[in-house]
Amino acid sequence: MAKTNIKPIMPSLREKKRYLAFEAITNSQIDFKKAKEDISNAFIDLHGTLGTSKIAPMFLENKWNNASKTGIIKIGHKHVDDMKAAFAIAGSDKIIYKSLGVSGILKKAESKFIKKSG
């Protein structure tokens, strides 16, 4: 049987991505795993498992800054408001998650919203 190659999706048909910068406001130290778990659980509570799988948020671990407790999430452009809504119910009494801003370019989101330590 002949092997057929699947054509890649044209750029105009691909989902456009956005980079959402966020901050964890807390007095104690928080790591990437805890922040990802809190936000993911809130997102699942809000949109369900099926909604979360369709939206497919991607947490960028290498963009997490422990000193400023800030990070970046890659998400589709249609679902930015859904992610911001999940921030409202994420965390606990001692942790608040806040959206810092949205950008279409990762480098710009990092330079504009993520504070560098040192």
Report the location of each language-model feature.
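Long, charge-dense
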Residues: A90-G118
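Broad gene-expression machinery/nucleic-acid interaction feature
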Residues: K17-Y19, T70, K94-I96
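Short amphipathic alpha-helices in soluble, non-transmembrane regions
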Residues: M83-A90
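Surface-exposed, low-hydrophobicity interaction/linker segments
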Residues: E23-K63, L106-A109, F113-S117
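Beta-strand cores of modular interaction/reader domains in eukaryotic scaffold and signaling proteins
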Residues: E23, I72-K74, K98
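N-terminal, charge-rich interaction modules
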Residues: M1-Q29
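Helix N-cap motif at beta-to-alpha junctions
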Residues: K74-D81
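The conserved glycine-aromatic submotif of the RRM
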Residues: K63-I72
